[in-house]
Amino acid sequence: RGSLSNTIIGKNTFLDNQVHIAHNNKIGNNCIIAGQVGFAGSSSIGDNVIIGGQAGIAGHLRIGNNIQIGGGSGVIKDVPDNSKVMGYPAKDLRYFIKDNK
């Protein structure tokens, strides 16, 4: 039981080593979270989300369903369903590749 609100981790969600999850977070079902990922407080992570190692999720965000977040990314705004994002700040993978050619 959390002091502010409960942090909830869904069924079949895998957390690797050194993952930091702050208060009031809700992580959906069937997610894979690689090592050294950090979640600030009060964010909502949907179902079927994959987060690469050393990514950071800012507080008070909504990460949709069926999302892929690249390793080392810094997510500072909401991510809509069925997206692939990468970089710092995290942006749609198509734009990340175009900007880093």
Task: Enumerate the predicted regions with their spans.
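Structural signal for interior beta-strand "rungs" in well-ordered beta-sheet cores
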Residues: 1-92
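Long, leucine- and charge-enriched amphipathic alpha-helices
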Residues: 97-101
